[in-house]
Amino acid sequence: MIRTVVRILAACALAFGLCAAAEASHLVTGNGFGFAVVAPESGTATKFYSHPYNYLRPDPKNPLGEGIEAPNFIKGLRWGARGAGKADYVEDSHIIRMRRGDGTATFFMPFGLVRPALIISLEAAPRKAARWRVEWNRPLRSQRAVGATGVRLLRFDGIDESLLLIPLGPVQIAPAGQPLAASSAWALIALETAKDAEPAVRDFTRWRSGLPARELAKRELAEFEQWRAKPAAHFRNDQERHLWRQSETMLRIAQSREPNRADRHGNGLIVAALPDVYSTPWVRDMAWSTMALIRMGHQAEARAALLAYFNAQPTGKMRAEVHGADYQISLVRYWGDGTEEPFFTQEGATNIEFDNWGEVLWVLGQYLSKYDDPALLKAATYRGRLYESARDFIVKPLIANTEKYGDGLIVAADTSIWEEHQPDKKHFAFSTTMAIVGLGEFAEIAGRAGDEPARRQALDAEALLQKGFAAAFIRDGKLHGTLEPGVKNDIDGALIPIINFGIVRDPKIIGDTVDRMELLKVASGGYRRVRGTYTDPKIFEYWYEQEEFLFVDFQLAELLRRLGREGEADAMLQRIVGKSAADHNIIPEMYVAVPCALFPGRIGDPTGAIPMVGYGPGAYVLHLLDREDGR
């Protein structure tokens, strides 16, 4: 996930006692049009992004780079003297409240305002005269008044977009260079063009309806509660309930609501993690987020995510690497504008991840099974009606990228779930698994569409893949992660979801796999993805593959529960729930197992991508729903 960080490491302190405890995670608010980040340890808001992702589009000067970065307007926004505050989400929502001795501040991005808007308000403590103080991320180039009293339009060097400041209370004279000191409450609204300033003021005025800042926060909270779906799971304690609610919030924050237009087709995409890390939509992580939305009952958001897969464009960039087959679903991830991004690993190669195609068919089939929405299959998308797009640009290229093995088929060599480097591509059991699952779902979809030839083709391919899987990946009574032998994937955390999907049913093989998972157990108490084979500490994966990976923990806990080992499963789950409760109900990508400069902190501290989305809240929600189904 966070391979995109710079891969040059400082010296690593391996001993537990040499690493200080990690600071509490930063809090993120968002409304589908942008993000803002609050850092409790400094009592400061540190970022305000004008888009709900980190990278807008490809960089034509560096096609294998991260892309054009989304504007961030602020480096630091605080009040009074710099100092730590106690911050948390209000009632498990996206509203952040920070308290210090000299006052209380509230930050949120409202869902009712269809713009990248951040509302901030400050209530000074008695006999305190706290005022907002801002450090802009880029030098201020110009500012001008816009119509109403106190409204200002700011332009910055190096940022094409503008920032509109609308006071929500009385305005006073502010020190030079500190416009936010003029009022205790503001709306900060990012604008793509300065000419949009007056329409934005009108939109804001309608949304505000004359309410003061405190009432705006109350109304936002009430509207958010109305949006929530009634939980379909029983909670065993309050911590589980709060983590469910906060996870539901994170899933909503992570989804783009930006409308599609001629130069942007990202509406509905869901990022894999929220800032401060790289907030980018990965096909795979988004599938787990979408599945959580489906099963929770958030049909509108799930439908938007599915449409996003089929409207993203341009795609099919890697046709030469996939036997010339044109395809719709990105082989790795997307830029914010919906352009396919074939993930660059900084080793000079793109990635091919065929499991993505099966995962999209999986979530599409599950959505249609739950909601019976025939109109979705007829919806106009980038490559025609959605059903035909799924058939011709997911199923056909998927089958075209299978290979004969024994009496069956397996998916061609790729980089799969753990994003291996393309020069190290292998035949992964997980990619063949997702092809089996996805084609099984598509057979049902084709039946709904009355397309018998496509249904039969999917079923035939599914059956051949089942045969190929058994021959290729079950050897000597053991389940292996790859066709190619090797210590790294012989026991692999990805084997657990394979079993949970029902691809492997032999109790002896399942039991052996669970027993061998002890080879992946780490000092923090959970499990890593694989046994890393890198020997150079300067390589990112040398450290990354030593840390505890929560997605594997969730999957193993579910398998243990199915095997009747309820006590072990509950202990694994409650450990994650308890650690999240101590950190604003945020679920990280990983826990520190081997402390180092890249993943600092004490053993067991949250690390990696924080807050995670699909592999965090999505995985947690699905785990509780699976537990409910097994009651």
Task: Give the residues covered by each predicted segment.
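Terminal accessory carbohydrate-recognition/targeting modules of carbohydrate-active enzymes
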Residues: 2, 22-239, 284-285, 294-300, ...
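Bacterial N-terminal signal peptides
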Residues: 8-17
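C-terminal capping/lid segments that line or modulate ligand- or cofactor-binding pockets
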Residues: 25-72, 278, 333-356, 360, ...
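Aromatic-rich carbohydrate-recognition surfaces in CAZymes
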Residues: 214, 278-402, 432, 611-627
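Well-ordered alpha-helical scaffold segments within catalytic/enzyme domains
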Residues: 228-236, 249-250, 287-300, 348, ...
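Long, well-ordered core segments of solenoidal/helical folds
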Residues: 247-260, 298-321, 329-330, 369, ...
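Acidic/His metal-coordination segments adjacent to aromatic residues that form catalytic metal sites
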Residues: 268-275, 331-351, 405-427, 476, ...
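Extended ligand-binding clefts on enzyme/binding-domain cores
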Residues: 314-342, 351, 426-437, 448-449, ...
